[in-house]
Each structure stands twice: as structure tokens, then as C-alpha cells.
Amino acid sequence: MIIIENATKKFGTQTVLNNVSLTLEDGKIYGFVGQNGCGKTVLFKSICGFIYLDRGTITVDGKVIGKDIDIIKDAGIIIESPGFLPNYSAFKNLKFLTMIKDNIGDEQIKRTLISVGLDPESKKVVGKFSLGMRQRLGIAQAIMENPHILILDEPMNGLDKRGVEDIRKILMDLKKKGKLILLASHNPLDIDILC
């Protein structure tokens, strides 16, 4: 569960978040819509602990961001464009991320890639991926460790119709498993279908 109380954030004279208060429960998908610059990404980065609020608190599973914990740890995150090693395959990119973790094996990486529609055996390097393929890899990175919370900023940006449908299905399955999912989208249809 995430509890946001009176979250306020300014950049110079511009107030981006103004006394935002929300309670976000496990097992649900919450949609955030709005034009560019309205504060969706700032809110997501604040929840993650990447940006600190000027006023207010964000509590994740009973722990206050910036006080009890600095950065949320049990979350899969896509904020803006995910960064990858361009000269390596999708499998090698995920493998690199797991080198510091002992609990993720090659089979889990392969299953995750397949679940987002990427071929784990492909030797194609990420630098040659289309935008949609990079988005799929970003989603794979976010869900690979089976996180409790998913924070997804425009995860379907650049995907074709089939890709969008695939990702919607993945998100619905994760919701059924009790995950708390925050989804920013410019497409109201995504929000209508998923939330």
C-alpha cells in the first residue's frame, strides 16, 4: 500500500505537485492521465525516492520515503526511457542486471522475455531494437524480479496494437496476483481498460 499525504513539490516558482493526497491499495491498477508537464513523472519519482518532496509524506508499506527508507526497493520501475547496453542482446541486458542478484537464473530471464514478446535466443543487439522492442525490454526489466509494486510511466509508448494488447494482458495478470500498479498514459483507452 502507498499512502501519499499532502505531497507538494516546486521547481523554482512552478508548483508541480500541490497537496496531493492518495491511498493506493494492493491488487489494483491506478491510472494517471494528463498532459506533459502536469506532474505524473514527478509524482512517480517522488514515490520511488528519486525526488524528495518540499512538503508532505509518502509511505510505502508502512515506511516513509526519505525517513525510514531512501529508495523504494520492492518495485519494478519504468520512468521515461529505460537505459540499456546498446551492443548487447535483450537476454544479455537482463543477465547483466541480475549479476548482482543470486535469485534470478537464466530460465527466469527467458520466461520474462517471452512474456513480453521478445525472443530470448535472439542475438539482435538492443541498439538495433525499434522503440516498441525497447519498451518491451523495459517492461521485462520491471517485472523480472516479481516486484510487489510496479510504477510504469508510459510503458506502452511506441508499441503497435498487438504489443499494447500483450502488455495490457500482462498488467491484468499482475493485478490478479495482488500487485499494486501505477500507470501513466496519454491514452485514455489504456486507463479505461486497465483501471
Could you tell me what each predicted segment is?
Residues C48:
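Helix-to-loop junction immediately C-terminal to a conserved catalytic motif
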